[in-house]
């Protein structure tokens, strides 16, 4: 975490940068307004209280899971309730988990899916060709999958029951797919030709599967969508019109989604 003293130092550094000519422009002042709002939110009693998971019932904590992933997902929901508008849940194993069976090394590991080797074993995944690199390659599927299924389903179910999904868009996303075939190291490498994402809330219909791949899961056979379409879908859900553009210094216009089209089945 970030202590109060370090947080204050960063605020002072930001204040010193705000004396620049760029900061005094209309765009810079608008950005400063957003920053001040974010700082007020971070230091508000509601946001501070959101980090206290002991305020939740035993049943809710059990439903999310008492492991680190469950705590992160539950915290995400509490931050939304506290008024935080954009929340990213990035699950990183904390150092206090070191030494537990099936877990990683000195600094903890990302509970991620970058599994190039040993994804079906019981211990931590190694690096390519057996060289241990757990800080990158994380934990194997037998450790990852049960906690993910439990925590993500709990998040969607809990937010729905609380009415939070009515005006909150939940996106479960990765940067790429994985190779349809297991490599010689017992893992799967990067694959950009097919991947899956999940949406919930903000008017998205539940229980729908959009698109399809071949029997190997390697190539899209129905309803091919691009990252630009994904981005445009989010902007449209947020009420940002397709014609909206950002402007760089010097007046250069930047398209938000580079011509992407919203995924029509989600509207």
Walk through the language-model features, giving the residues of each:
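Ligand-binding pockets and gating/stacking loops
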Residues: 1-267
């Amino acid at each position: 975490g970030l202590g109060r003293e370090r947080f204050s130092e960063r605020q002072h550094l930001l204040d010193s940068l705000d004396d620049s000519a760029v900061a005094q422009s209309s765009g810079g002042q608008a950005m400063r307004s957003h920053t001040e709002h974010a700082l007020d939110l971070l230091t508000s009693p509601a946001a501070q209280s959101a980090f206290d998971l002991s305020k939740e019932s035993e049943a809710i904590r059990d439903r999310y899971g008492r492991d680190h992933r469950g705590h992160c997902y539950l915290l995400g929901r509490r931050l939304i309730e506290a008024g935080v508008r954009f929340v990213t849940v990035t699950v990183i194993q904390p150092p206090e988990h070191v030494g537990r069976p099936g877990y990683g090394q000195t600094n903890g590991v990302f509970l991620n899916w970058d599994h190039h080797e040993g994804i079906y074993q019981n211990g931590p995944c190694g690096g390519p060709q057996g060289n241990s690199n757990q800080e990158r390659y994380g934990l194997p599927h037998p450790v990852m999958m049960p906690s993910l299924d439990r925590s993500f389903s709990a998040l969607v179910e809990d937010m729905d029951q609380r009415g939070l999904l009515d005006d909150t868009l939940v996106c479960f996303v990765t940067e790429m797919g994985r190779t349809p075939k297991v490599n010689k190291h017992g893992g799967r490498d990067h694959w950009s030709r097919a991947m899956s994402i999940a949406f919930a809330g903000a008017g998205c219909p539940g229980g729908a599967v959009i698109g399809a791949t071949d029997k190997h899961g390697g190539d899209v056979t129905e309803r091919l969508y691009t990252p630009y379409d994904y981005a445009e879908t989010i902007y449209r859900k947020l009420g940002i019109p397709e014609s909206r553009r950002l402007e760089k210094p010097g007046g250069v216009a930047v398209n938000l989604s580079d011509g992407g089209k919203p995924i029509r089945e989600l509207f």
